[in-house]
Amino acid sequence: MSQYQNQYGAQTGMTDEYGNPVNQVDQYGNPISGGGGLTGEAGRQHYGTTGGATGQGHGHGQQHRGVDQTTGYGTHTGGVGGYGTKPEYGSTNTGSGYGTGTGYGGSGTNPDYGSTNTGSGYGTGTGYGGSGTTEYVREEHHGDKKGVMDKIKEKIPGTEQSRTNTDGTGYGSTGQGYVREQQHGTGYGSTGQGYVREQQDVHHGDEQHGEKKGIMEKIKEKLPGTGACTGH
């Protein structure tokens, strides 16, 4: 009996005030058996990556005669963490804008063509002067006066019928070459000069039947060798 009393006495310290056995718990709330009972270790299962809720420990204590067996089931189930399925994709920005604007300038079709007369103005200035005229003058003086030139010719030796052959240098009209000037063309026409030989054949047949003579006629009479030219 004493053995049983010692056992019961030892067990009385593990009962509450009503005689019910008291289950001792650890710092996590899991029951600890005081006798030869088996204490089940709370199994912990954690799911998810975020912090889950605190687990709930359900302890079921059953006391049998002579056997203090406490089986604790700790089902500490953590909350399942949500999966971050929001990938933020940056825009690839593969829009390659092709600036293929090849601006073609309008071809300049406004060439200023200078005159093809590259300074060679064609002034074929062959100016032809008036052709020399041969004048036959027959003067018959039936009056008193003679001209001045007639009187001089009478006093010159051998000029009874003096044939004057004057080689004059008659200048023809200057030929002007007209150059058609287009844009920026400068053509110069050379002025041509034509030389004309004038030949004048003057034949004087003088018949004088007057009385008075002019001044030049008197001068001619005074010249030597001219007495045969005049007659009174």
From Swiss-Prot:
Gly residues: compositionally biased ranges: 49-60
Recorded family membership: Belongs to the plant dehydrin family.
UniProt-listed PROSITE patterns: DEHYDRIN_2 (PS00823)
Species per Swiss-Prot/TrEMBL record: Pisum sativum
Transcription as UniProt keyword: no
Amino-acid biosynthesis in keyword set: no
Protein name per Swiss-Prot or TrEMBL: Dehydrin DHN3
Induction (free text): By abscisic acid (ABA) and water stress.
BP-aspect Gene Ontology terms: cold acclimation; response to abscisic acid; response to water deprivation
Annotated Gene Ontology cellular component terms: cytosol
Transmembrane segments: none
Comp. bias regions, Polar residues: 1-14, 159-168
Region of interest (Disordered), ranges: 1-66, 140-232
Residue ranges with Basic and acidic residues bias: 140-157, 198-223
Keywords: Stress response
